[in-house]
């Protein structure tokens, strides 16, 4: 993500007029997971009515990705928000609901998180649809229910989703079973786009160490000593390509 794209995304977040109320539960029992750059908590949201009708808008559960306060994590969060906005809606990609600056919740006492340390710096909040579990969790707890037809259906859905991403010049960069969510009817949804790469990025990625998870990482990412970013003349590392996702998908399956 270039500096201009980063500034544009930050301005979009701060200038949004989403008319959405959010309740964020930072208690440990509501923690859904965590990663290198963020923690995910259960939340609830509803959007304000845009007309004068008396229809009641109910609260809906959501997953709130609370990005760590350090610069690297905030940049990864902005990159994920940018990627999800750019890709748009897809049946097998987690749905982006909104992106907020946590300062907005602090400034509005009616929306303030119920648990919040006063010395904790504000974070970027990525509000996503809430799904029951990850593929990893389901396979561990329902071993007898995961038969070959179900696994083949998941494989087809994942392959079609990766193909769709690649047709739009997007490399997910961190495909693994923990980043695959399941709906109530056991359809898959790919999540965690914080490592995403775009083939036409204005600022190519040259750091292989920050891409992917070691157990699912393509072997060429471990052989980088013969390549110098200084000699690349603005080009991305040759290993950072669509083949990364193909290898990771093969490991997952």
Label the predicted regions.
Residues 95-122:
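Short beta-strand micro-motifs within the conserved protein kinase catalytic domain, predominantly
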Residues 119-134:
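Conserved short submotifs of the Hanks-type protein kinase catalytic core
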Residues 67-91, 97:
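The N-lobe alphaC helix and its flanking beta3-alphaC-beta4 segment of protein kinase-like domains
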Residues 183-219, 223-227:
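Activation segment/activation loop of eukaryotic-type protein kinase catalytic domains
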Residues 1-23, 27-30:
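Juxta-kinase regulatory segment immediately upstream of eukaryotic protein kinase catalytic domains
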Residues 43-75:
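ATP-binding glycine-rich loop module of kinase domains
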Residues 166-183:
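Catalytic-loop of the protein kinase fold
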Residues 154-155:
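Activation segment signature within eukaryotic-like protein kinase domains
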């Amino acid at each position: 993500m270039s500096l201009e794209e980063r500034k544009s995304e930050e301005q979009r977040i701060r200038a949004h007029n989403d008319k959405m109320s959010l309740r964020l539960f930072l208690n440990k029992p509501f923690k859904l997971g965590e990663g290198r750059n963020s923690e995910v908590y259960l939340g609830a949201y509803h959007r304000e009515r845009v007309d004068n009708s008396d229809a009641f808008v109910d609260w809906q559960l959501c997953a709130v990705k609370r990005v760590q306060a350090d610069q690297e994590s905030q940049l990864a969060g902005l990159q994920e928000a940018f990627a999800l906005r750019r890709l748009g809606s897809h049946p097998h990609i987690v749905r982006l609901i909104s992106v907020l600056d946590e300062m907005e919740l602090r400034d509005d006492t009616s929306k303030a998180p119920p648990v919040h340390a006063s010395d904790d710096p504000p974070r970027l909040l990525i509000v996503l649809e809430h799904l029951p579990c990850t593929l990893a969790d389901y396979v561990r707890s329902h071993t007898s229910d995961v038969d070959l037809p179900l696994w083949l259906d998941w494989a087809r859905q994942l392959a079609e989703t990766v193909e769709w991403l690649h047709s739009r010049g997007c490399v997910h960069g961190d495909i693994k079973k923990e980043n695959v969510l399941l709906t109530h009817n056991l359809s898959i949804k790919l999540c965690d786009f914080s490592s995403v790469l775009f083939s036409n990025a204005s600022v190519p990625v040259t750091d292989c160490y920050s891409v992917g998870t070691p157990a699912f990482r393509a072997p060429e990412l471990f052989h980088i000593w013969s390549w110098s970013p200084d000699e690349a003349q603005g080009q991305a590392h040759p290993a950072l390509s669509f083949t990364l996702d193909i290898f990771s998908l093969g490991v997952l399956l």
